[in-house]
């Protein structure tokens, strides 16, 4: 491995966090009486020094191997977690080491689960920092790095192919070295649009920027204890639904729609499949809520049904009601739709609707093959014919997802968590959704979780964000070196 390449590029990733820590300091100074000012200054100083250190003492190198790329991705995320927890840890309050780590990982992985029982106790600078970790993690700490690497660099091409899922390249066609800029342009466009809409709908500028950071990353952190419900506004509810959906759609499709001023990309079969899942689940959720009793009118049932289905399937985790007051069917449905999640090429976590669509198409192919053994059946996604070599890794990923869930649930039960809470929390963590059931529901907190369970959820959040494979690659590299 080329340690020079690894250290310099991981340093770049840390500087992205340092930049937003600096912005948090400005927020603290603007507030005037911010108790986290010292914590933010110390955190920024440490992160900036460590991030800039390789540029002073390590010579530049453009050679990058496959192994170097995996190490850059994994270390960029891990060190972002470590330095990202510093503001919480130094400020104190409810942030023990494990709680600070949980909050940081939840932020960067855009999960949105929290250990805080009173979010509104945090000073503005920490609230802004929480939302900033969503913004950084939504685009990806490695993507921030890629934005400053020349497009002609072979390093950029290799890292792009590692960090950007191959599924995300199926929805549209563009040169690989433009992929990162397309994602960044759409990401910033959604952020600015969400901020303006929230602000015009009645949020303060501070709340608007925090919720814009959160919604574009499909994260879920809010500045309020009751999440979106705090604003008690149907306009804000609808704005949130729209932007949660947009942030969960393939960014390439959104880019092409605006670039060509054509709605043709909306005929994408995966997008139609994803939208169909949302419609069916929303109808089921609304009917379930209405059947519970008079506390939910038809209007409330429909709004809650659509909002929470989009919130869960987009892996955002915003809420307008407490799922502990729902009928069991609605609560379980919320967990089930956390598995397929949004589309590849978006900021969502989970298995991705693309893989579920691919799996169903493959099952259909195999059924046809069983009925007509002599026929030649191919998996089509739109106009593209996928080979077995292209399909296989995605089916394996689905299997890996459920194996990871099974192992996590077993370990969580050992830590003292009940079976139903373990299943819900592990699916939520691995899919980067946030809310689960019970005390850890839509308006709850993971503060009561055992330390071991919190650590399990932290690992799940990380695995879900990087889609498992890079972690397995680094572990395999470590074992191969040890056995030499």
Describe every region a protein language model picked out.
Residues 1-484:
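Membrane-proximal intracellular helices of multi-pass ion channels
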